[in-house]
């Protein structure tokens, strides 16, 4: 009878090396698809399914859902009124996975995810309005933007950069298709504004970020009004913006009634928020720009105010605000006098100028280097130590 071999215990040195190995993250590689629900740390859709499996959680969520549908969304200046039974339902959800769940702007079923987020938002705060809590989780990608500037030789050498970025979009099948879709929806004497906005939202959500940013944030010479006009007309303002400027507070109230618009506005205020009078910004410029572009196609669509500068503003007014005049001007100024947004736009335009300058010989590498300025996509400092630990471990295990 053959006795089974008992596995020999690992020596202490091997166990120590195993403990030294850090957990390996799984960043999105160059060819990976857009983030899906499964890639999110705590998707609200997944959290909702977990809640449905628990009778107590499911009942509390349904009750809270009926509360949020019957209670109007409070504005920042208003004190929310929450019935006691709704507060009790919110309290029952505070230990569930729904608290802290997130969404992603490019995920499937995004609106359904945001509906869940804003339903449990009351449970997060127990009735206190939290304007600065973005429902979006940032997903880092390492995909570089590859482009061939030699294809622009068909343009005149002195063509403005907005025309060059428009050509780059035309040469890209996906960007060209999405741009034509909103161009058709937003043109004509009798355009349907809601259709135009929906196609604009689709473009800035699905087009590659460098293409979208290049089209909208292309730099122009100070005296080049034609370039400035092309840039300002990128979002087809004659159709996308309201013909008569509404009151800014009414525009915000309309935005808050839509989960998607509300989410984009909160995301913008989260990532473009000046922290102090010195203009210290809450997050890095790339996130501010991403949040800014996320507003295009919503009720809060901003745009450049003229053809001669890069100032942006909402298409609204503070006339008729009464006692809320100061609050209205603060909302308006968050776009027109926001140092974080202004500097983020200026920095991106400087980068776009460098892409086409003669002393920038490797455009593909330049884009990758610029993306790596974001600390979230830099190589992790433990990568060399991971290799140095793994090689001795393999050798020891082979000898053992």
Curated annotation (Swiss-Prot):
Endpoints of the signal sequence: 1-31
Lipid attachment locations (GPI-anchor amidated asparagine): 374
PTM section of the record: N-glycosylated.
Membrane topology: Lipid-anchor; GPI-anchor
Pfam families in the cross-refs: GDNF (PF02351)
Location of this chain's protein in the cell: Cell membrane
Keywords (A to Z) from UniProt: Cell membrane, Disulfide bond, Glycoprotein, GPI-anchor, Lipoprotein, Membrane, Receptor, Signal
GO MF: axon guidance receptor activity; glial cell-derived neurotrophic factor receptor activity; signaling receptor activity; signaling receptor binding
InterPro entries membership: GDNF/GAS1, GDNF_alpha, GDNF_rcpt, GDNF_rcpt_A3
Top-level taxon: Eukaryota
Glycan-carrying positions: 95, 148, 309
SMART domains linked to this entry: GDNF
Family assignment from sequence similarity: Belongs to the GDNFR family.
Annotated PANTHER family: GDNF FAMILY RECEPTOR ALPHA-3, GDNF RECEPTOR ALPHA
Function in brief: Receptor for artemin (ARTN), a growth factor that supports the survival of sensory and sympathetic peripheral neurons. ARTN-binding leads to autophosphorylation and activation of the RET receptor.
Protein name per Swiss-Prot or TrEMBL: GDNF family receptor alpha-3
Organism: Homo sapiens (Human)
Lineage summary: Eukaryota, Metazoa, Chordata, Craniata, Vertebrata
């Amino acid at each position: 009878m053959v006795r089974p071999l008992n596995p020999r215990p690992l020596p202490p040195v091997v166990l120590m090396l195993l403990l030294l190995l850090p957990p390996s993250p799984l960043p999105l590689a160059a060819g990976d698809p857009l983030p899906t629900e499964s890639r999110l740390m705590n998707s609200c859709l997944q959290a909702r399914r977990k809640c449905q499996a628990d009778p107590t959680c499911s009942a509390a969520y349904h009750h809270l859902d009926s509360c949020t549908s019957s209670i109007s969304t409070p504005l920042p200046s208003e004190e929310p009124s929450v019935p006691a039974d709704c507060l009790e339902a919110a309290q029952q959800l505070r230990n569930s996975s729904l608290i802290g769940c997130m969404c992603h702007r490019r995920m499937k079923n995004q609106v359904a995810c945001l509906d869940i987020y804003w339903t449990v938002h009351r449970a997060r705060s127990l009735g206190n309005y939290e304007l600065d809590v973005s429902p979006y989780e940032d997903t880092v990608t390492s995909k570089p933007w590859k482009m061939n500037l030699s294809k622009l030789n068909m343009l005149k050498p002195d063509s403005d950069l907005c025309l060059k970025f428009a050509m780059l979009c035309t040469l890209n099948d996906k960007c060209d298709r999405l741009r034509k879709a909103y161009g058709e929806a937003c043109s004509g004497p009798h355009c349907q504004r809601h259709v135009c906005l929906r196609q604009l939202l689709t473009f800035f959500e699905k087009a590659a970020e460098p293409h979208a940013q290049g089209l909208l944030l292309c730099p122009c010479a100070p005296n080049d009004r034609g370039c400035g006009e092309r840039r300002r007309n990128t979002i087809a303002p004659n159709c996308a913006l309201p013909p008569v400027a509404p009151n800014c507070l009414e525009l915000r109230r309309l935005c808050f009634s839509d989960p998607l618009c509300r989410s984009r506005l909160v995301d913008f205020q989260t990532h473009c928020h000046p922290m102090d009078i010195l203009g210290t910004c809450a997050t890095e410029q790339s996130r501010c720009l991403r949040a800014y572009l996320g507003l295009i196609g919503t009720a809060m669509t901003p745009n450049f105010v003229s053809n001669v500068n890069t100032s942006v503003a909402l298409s609204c007014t503070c006339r008729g605000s009464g006692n809320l005049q100061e609050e209205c001007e603060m909302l308006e100024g968050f776009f027109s006098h926001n140092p974080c947004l202004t500097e983020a736009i200026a920095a991106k335009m400087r980068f776009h100028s460098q892409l086409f300058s003669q002393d920038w010989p490797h455009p593909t590498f330049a884009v990758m280097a610029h993306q790596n300025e974001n600390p979230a996509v830099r190589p992790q400092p433990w990568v060399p130590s991971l290799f140095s630990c793994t090689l001795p471990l393999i050798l020891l295990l082979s000898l053992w």
